[in-house]
C-alpha cells in the first residue's frame, strides 16, 4: 500500500479512533491487555530479522508499526486501512498460499460468528507456509469465575456483550477448531485467572491493582481458569 494512502477507519475505530495506541488505564481489562502485549512482543523478538509476518485483525496496526523496521510484517483488518494495514476480510485473505512464515491473530476470532471462525482459521493455515507458526489470543468463555457462576446460577459469564463477541466460546472449542484447520498446538499460556472476588476488585480498579493481576497470573497460570489464552500453533 503506498505511503500516501489515507487512513480509513470503520466500525469501532470510526467512533473511538486509534484507541489501542494509548489504552485507557481505567479499562477493566487494561492489565490483561498489557500482559498479552508483553507475551506477544517476547514471541516476536525471538524471530529472525526479515521474517515474513502477518498480523490478521491488527486494528490500527500497533505491532505492525512497532516491528516494521526489523520484520517483514504487514497487517489486515476488516475495519481499518493505512500505510501498513490492508482492509480485508479474515475469511478471504488477499494473499497467495504459503506467503508468511508467522502470523498473529490477537483477540479477533471472538468478534466473528461461529460460521466465520473456521473459515478464518482455514485462511490463516493457507497463507502460512508448512512448519510456519501462528500466535492466537482468545478470551475464554469458561474461565474460573464463569464456571463458578454456572454452578451457582446456571449460566456462564460472557466475555463481552453478544453483539461485540458473537463467537464467544470456551477455549477448548477454539483448540478443537484449530486442530480441524490443520494446526498443531505447540504451547498454551493463560493470562488472568479469574479468582472470584479478586477478579471483581481488579476489574473495578485495574491500574491500581495491576500488581495483584500479575501475582494471580504468576501463581495460578492454569489456562482453563484464565480469562485470556495465548495459543501457539504450528502448521503441520
Model-identified regions with their sequence ranges:
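A short glycine-rich, Lys/Arg-flanked "PGG" loop and its adjoining helix->strand segment in the class I
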Residues: 118-130
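Acceptor-substrate binding/catalytic loop of class I
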Residues: 157-173
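Short "lid" loop at the C-terminus of a central beta-strand within the Rossmann-like core
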Residues: 140-144, 191-193
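A SAM-dependent methyltransferase catalytic signature shared across enzymes that methylate proteins
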Residues: 172-189
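Conserved N-terminal segment of class I S-adenosyl-L-methionine
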Residues: 1-96, 102-106, 118-121, 167, ...
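Short catalytic micro-motifs in class I SAM-dependent methyltransferases
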Residues: 107-111
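A C-terminal cap/extension of S-adenosyl-L-methionine-dependent methyltransferases
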Residues: 135, 151-153, 186-236
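Conserved beta-strand signature within the Rossmann-like core of class I S-adenosyl-L-methionine
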Residues: 131-138
